[in-house]
């Protein structure tokens, strides 16, 4: 089971991998009423130059999460549930859930608490997947959590608008059965990227091998890359696009991470089975921005102070 995402952002996110073994005591970093827990599973996350703010990751059970920007997000009003900060929320799910269903149950019991990071209160929605092929999307609209799971298609996600509206837009295009509809759009805006990704995912050939499957999925996700210097058209005038800083692809079945970093140009992978997730093992890190990273890099991780 494979899943891939692009990280499109207007500023360098200092992409850094962190390896967390199981058995670590953690805090939700959400102020009064923060959750406390001990990690049940090991994980690898992509942090923004810090182990306390991650946007992507996978655990040893094959559960993955991804945070993507969603303009218009309105988080829930703080209530009595134990809180977990936005930067820690993905780690919290990976630490405690083996699959999508368990992660969704946790999200009902523990509240995501927004926080400012590098001067910005980030509006995000979350995609999660597991090794069985189950997936879900979680959005925060009108101060309520909305979950797309089961009957709702959750195999593609970009940015705004919300997923329900994105799915409605698909009916405007010939690729999705509208004989009088539009051809595939070529812009870099989120709707155009959502339509293209949905279309190409439908037409990918059945792979004859795992390497073929990985190559096919990379070929599809690269069609949604935003080039550096791109602009987003709008009635009010073009605005600068957010270039693709990196692409991650997770093999949820075999616990492997494939990573393509744009600047500096790095293309490498991580075999999680070569990492030590045992209780008492050190937390490790590896910057994805070290020039010249190639091949399998699990041996390049170094210890880092945590808490």
Describe these PLM feature segments.
Residues 1-2, 10, 16, 106, ...:
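C-terminus-biased signal that marks the final domain/tail of proteins
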Residues 2-4, 64-67, 127-129, 137, ...:
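Structural recognition of the beta-strand scaffold that forms the well-ordered cores
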């Amino acid at each position: 089971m494979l899943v891939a995402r692009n990280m499109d952002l207007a500023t360098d996110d200092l992409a850094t991998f962190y390896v967390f073994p199981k058995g670590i005591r953690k805090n939700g970093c959400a102020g009064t009423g923060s959750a406390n827990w001990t990690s049940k599973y090991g994980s690898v996350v992509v942090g923004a130059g810090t182990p306390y703010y991650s946007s992507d990751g996978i655990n040893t059970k094959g559960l993955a999460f991804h945070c993507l920007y969603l303009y218009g997000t309105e988080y829930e009003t703080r209530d009595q549930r134990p809180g977990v900060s936005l930067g820690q929320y993905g780690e919290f799910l990976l630490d405690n859930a083996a699959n999508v269903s368990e992660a969704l149950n946790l999200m009902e019991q523990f509240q995501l608490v927004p926080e400012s990071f590098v001067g910005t209160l980030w509006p995000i929605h979350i995609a999660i997947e597991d090794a069985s092929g189950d997936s879900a999307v979680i959005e925060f609209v009108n101060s309520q959590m909305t979950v797309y799971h089961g009957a709702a298609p959750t195999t593609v996600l970009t940015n705004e608008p919300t997923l329900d509206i994105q799915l409605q837009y698909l009916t405007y295009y010939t690729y999705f059965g509208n004989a009088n509809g539009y051809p595939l759009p070529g812009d870099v805006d989120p709707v155009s990227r959502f339509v293209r990704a949905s279309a190409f995912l439908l037409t990918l050939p059945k792979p004859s091998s795992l390497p073929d499957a990985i190559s096919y999925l990379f070929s599809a996700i690269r069609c949604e890359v935003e080039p550096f210097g791109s602009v987003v058209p709008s009635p009010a005038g073009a605005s600068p696009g957010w270039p693709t800083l990196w692409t991650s692809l997770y093999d949820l079945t075999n616990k492997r991470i494939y990573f393509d970093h744009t600047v500096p140009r790095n293309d490498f992978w991580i075999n999680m089975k070569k990492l030590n997730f045992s209780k008492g093992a050190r937390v490790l890190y590896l910057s994805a921005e070290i020039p010249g990273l190639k091949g399998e890099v699990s041996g390049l991780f170094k210890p880092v102070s945590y808490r």
